[in-house]
């Protein structure tokens, strides 16, 4: 099979990442740090009016974070941002999404699984009726069902990690690890129990220097040093 042509990554100009403090915004920060890219941070927070300003709405009518500006390109959705950054700036040693067709398909399969089954269908339901119950109302049965569903979906992760890979796709860190780890951390914060192998995996992934830098960049303004 012919291998995809290796292209030189675009150098790019000014990069601005809007959004801090959430499990979704940290994904974009993490990818930027893993790729060694410089960028400016706009410490916009969710649900405090920051995303409803005329300035931000002009960038995205969705009024959601994270949002990446890369020169004249504006892109939202954390998984799309991570994939774009890898495709545009990734080098052989730090690319987050493989170039080969099968490797890319497997990575994106994991990414789409995490975003749809773990994030949107499970964890965000818990958030809506937990942290945001003053908006969406309390729904204990929905929260319980979401917790059970999350744990059920995590079985495929447990089986994969049962073969003792360092990362979810083996020995290489990818975008799938960024998305999966942020969901595991999110679940643990909600006191959702997960397998020991999952906890150990998450410790390995979050021990990366790029994660520590992302945590600092993702901190809300009041939590920043000197802030």
Regions found by a protein language model. Name each.
Residues 49, 222-223:
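Generic structural signal for helix capping and beta-alpha/helix-loop junctions
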Residues 45, 175, 218-219:
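Short, solvent-exposed turn/loop segments enriched in Gly/Ser/Thr/Pro and often Arg
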Residues 93-99, 121-124, 166-171, 196, ...:
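Short, hydrophobic secondary-structure boundary micro-motifs
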Residues 114-207:
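GST-like fold's C-terminal all-alpha helical module
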Residues 80, 197, 210:
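Residue-level recognition of oxygen-bearing side chains
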Residues 2-141:
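GST-like domain detector, emphasizing the conserved glutathione-binding G-site
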Residues 86, 183-184, 215:
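Active-site-flanking alpha-helical
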């Amino acid at each position: 099979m012919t291998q995809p042509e290796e292209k030189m990554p675009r150098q790019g100009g000014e990069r601005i990442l809007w959004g801090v403090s959430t499990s979704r915004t940290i994904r974009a920060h993490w990818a930027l740090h893993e790729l060694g890219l410089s960028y400016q941070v706009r410490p916009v927070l969710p649900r405090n009016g920051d995303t409803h300003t005329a300035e931000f709405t002009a960038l995205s009518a969705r009024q959601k974070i994270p949002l990446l500006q890369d020169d004249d390109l504006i892109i939202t959705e954390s998984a799309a941002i991570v994939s774009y950054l890898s495709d545009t700036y990734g080098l052989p040693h730090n690319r987050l999404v493989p170039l080969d067709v099968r490797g890319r398909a497997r990575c994106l399969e994991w990414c789409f699984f995490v975003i749809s089954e773990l994030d949107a269908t499970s964890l965000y339901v818990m958030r809506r009726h937990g942290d945001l119950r003053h908006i969406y109302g309390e729904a204990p049965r929905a929260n319980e069902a979401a917790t059970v569903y999350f744990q059920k979906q995590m079985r495929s992760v447990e089986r994969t990690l049962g073969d003792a890979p360092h990362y979810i796709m083996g020995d290489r860190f990818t975008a799938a690890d960024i998305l999966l780890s942020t969901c595991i951390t999110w679940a643990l914060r909600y006191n959702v129990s997960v397998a020991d192998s999952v906890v150990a995996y998450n410790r390995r992934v979050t021990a990366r220097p790029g994660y520590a830098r992302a945590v600092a960049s993702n901190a809300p303004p009041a939590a920043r040093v000197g802030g």
